[in-house]
From Swiss-Prot:
InterPro entries: Ribosomal_uS2, Ribosomal_uS2_bac/mit/plastid, Ribosomal_uS2_CS, Ribosomal_uS2_flav_dom_sf. HAMAP family: Ribosomal_uS2_B. Residues 255-280 have a biased composition (Low complexity). The keyword Ribosomal protein applies. Belongs to the universal ribosomal protein uS2 family. It comes from Corynebacterium kroppenstedtii (strain DSM 44385 / JCM 11950 / CIP 105744 / CCUG 35717). This is Small ribosomal subunit protein uS2. Residues 231-286 are annotated as: Disordered. Keywords: Ribonucleoprotein, Ribosomal protein. Pfam families: Ribosomal_S2 (PF00318). The gene is rpsB. It comes from the Bacteria. One of its GO terms (biological process) is translation. GO terms for molecular function: structural constituent of ribosome.
Length: 286
């Protein structure tokens, strides 16, 4: 079964590119025609690239990796948050902080501060002994951190791969991923540079429905990857249990078997001797 159908892509407007005067010549190979001053993306290629990206994301997650979802433009914010939360992956949908990947240790400290403020806010007497002004300042700090870092609050290491809606807007994220050799999976509109993306999906990154559809596809790949990971872990556990249940020949058991064999041999010899003696006695009496 196809990951997504041609009809779904058409209905979401994935085939609409930018105006012909706003394009990147490197995207020429993904364009099928031009209509009313708008480039039309070849959806047949899009379907092929979707399959490749889907398989990559699925395998990455199946082997224990995580995917960071990034989309800070208004058209992508809701879809990025919704789909990432659906599959339990980190996301950034408001503002990309410089160094979020390349300086992750510092960002991780800020995450610690965020959790500290959240715990303080959740506690019954968390603000006890503080003035109203101090409480207000702490609340504002928490809200600011939640807005920027809330989506990655549970991310303890840099991601295995990154999903991006609009590589031009998220150029800092793309640059940081390249420096750390983190694979980039992204929507490529006709004004984007395909050279900076490892797993491109030619398509419209400006339409809400297009961004939502393609982000949903990547989220589904994550979901399938998690299922494959769970099945693999279950199979390994079952195999390990089978190995433990299998009979193991130990040195002690070998010795015991040898001892039993020796005892049996002795008994046989003794029985033979007794029979011989009886036969001799009978012969003498005759």
């Amino acid at each position: 079964m196809a990951v997504v159908t041609m009809r779904q892509l058409l209905d979401a407007g994935v085939h609409f590119g930018h105006q012909t005067r706003r394009w990147n010549p490197k995207m020429k190979r993904y364009i099928i025609t031009e209509r009313n001053g708008i480039y039309i993306i070849d959806l047949q290629q899009t379907l092929t690239y979707i399959d490749s990206a889907y398989e990559f994301v699925k395998e990455t997650v199946a082997h224990g990796g995580n995917i960071l979802f990034v989309g800070t433009k208004k058209q992508a914010q809701e879809a990025v948050a919704t789909e990432a939360e659906r599959v339990g992956m980190p996301y950034v949908n408001h503002r990309w902080l410089g160094g979020m990947l390349t300086n992750f240790q510092t960002v991780h400290k800020r995450l610690g501060r965020l959790k500290e403020l959240q715990a303080m806010d959740a506690a019954e007497n968390g603000y006890e002994g503080r003035t109203k002004k101090e409480v207000l300042m702490l609340t504002r700090e928490r809200q600011k951190l939640e807005r920027v870092l809330g989506g990655i609050s549970d991310m303890n290491k840099v991601p295995s791969a990154i999903w991006i809606v609009d590589t031009n807007k998220e150029h800092i994220a793309v640059s940081e991923a390249q420096k750390l050799n983190i694979p980039v999976v992204a929507i490529l509109d006709t004004n984007c540079d395909p050279d900076v993306v490892d797993y491109p999906i030619p398509g419209n990154d400006d339409a809400i429905r297009s961004a939502a559809l393609l982000t949903g596809v990547i989220a589904s790949a994550v979901e399938d990857g998690k299922k494959a990971r769970a099945e693999r872990a279950q199979a390994e556990a079952k195999a390990a249990a089978g190995d433990n249940d299998a009979p193991v020949s130990s040195e002690g058991e070998s010795t015991e078997v040898a001892s039993d064999a020796a005892s049996t041999a002795s008994e046989t010899t003794a029985t033979s001797s007794d029979e011989s003696a009886a036969e001799s006695s009978e012969a003498e009496s005759k």
